[in-house]
Amino acid sequence: MPAPFECPVIRQRNLAVLLLGLAGNPSAPPEALVRLAAANIDRTQLARRRDLPAQAAVILADDKDANLRSELAANPNLPAEVQIVLARDVDAQVRGRLAEGAEYFTTVGVHARRFPGPLSDDVYELLARDPEPKVRRALAFNRHLPDDIRARMLDDHDVRTAAIAAAEWHPAPTARISELLSRATGAFGRELLLLRLDGPLPAEAARGMLADIDSSTDPANSAGLLRQIAATAVLDADLTGRFLTDLPLRAAVAANPTLDPEHVAALAHDPDNQVRAAVVARRGLDPALRESVSVEYDDRSSGNAVEWLLAEDMSEPDQLAFARSRHQVFRKTLAMRTDLSDEAVGILSADESFAVRLFVCERQPNAPGWLLAHIAAGWKSYSRWDMLAHKNFPADAATALARSDDPHDRVVAAAHPGLPFETIEALLADDTDYVRRRAATNPSLPTDRLMTLLEADEPAVVSGAAANRTLLVVTMHQVLDQARL
């Protein structure tokens, strides 16, 4: 057995597998990542790393593989000098990937949506003048696009680019609504535009769109747009009457902040459950009226959050009041926030609603271990991985999952640091290769055992051991030396 600080002699056939594992090792230092950038392996995982050093990014940006450069372009943490290089890339796919600034998912919180920061102004200017319409269209989707550049793109000679630039303005200026509607002429584009308006839709603009819909040969295609008009327009008596007589629009108009109090009070007793739910979710509604309204919610649905509650500045008494609300939608939305007091988390942890308890496990840094264990035992979705990584997840519950007959249970538990050594060893000999690989990443493996795994005959185990965050940096460099990097 090799000494703890001595790298084993790596079999040549395992060298590429080792390098792939190192590329995903969260503890790999910047200098190791720079060396890996020149490796003859699939480096897409390396290109996606948020901690990719600038020097490594420069190397990857000059690579001949367009798919690799495209993955690099999607990395939200690139230095400006690399962004400029990619904005001038010969491949339109690479430039478009850089331009879109698409959302990505992270396990900080729980696979919560994150959006990259803005690109440099020079990059935006360059991409806005790109000769390929598909690149400019991708840029028009970018939520960080400066307003002056977006305004210029409203006059793009490519009609589709101009329409996207209008519909994706976030927040869209109500003062320019006529101009924006003249560009976003499709029903779906207009629906998106109204969703992003920075204020209520002027009644005159609403009437203009309604006239277009009424004269359309396919009014059914505008059902979503109609609901958005009803929810955002400045309501007068005529508009209110029209919307309230159309049953599919009653819930939308019930959510409209300009609806007069008399109609709000009447709709609170509407026979339609969706209409009452829309009334209940109104911002500024009298708490007594809200709590008097009966609404049924789909307990297995993660949708229907109360958006304003997510951003509301709340005191602890406010938190506790919503945590005890009769309405599941408020308790569920509250559970999505990460600034809750221990008392509020305690109340929500014992909630009768599965959806509320699930969000406690997914979003709360102080979620109780007993609840994490209970939910993870039966919850098979992606967020279970985050629950097992939660600092409060009990070791005995992880061990029970690791000994399950289901490999999907075993793999999710295989990297838990609280597993007994004999359980980890059993997982390393598991019948399923992805379980064995995951077990090799367990941070509780002793250094000498980890070193022997680097010499294993099986690529899955070798790759997992190389990705283990406790692997010594000196060993990483010794592997890179053997690869002549």
Label every model-predicted segment.
Residues 1-485:
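Alpha-helical scaffold segments
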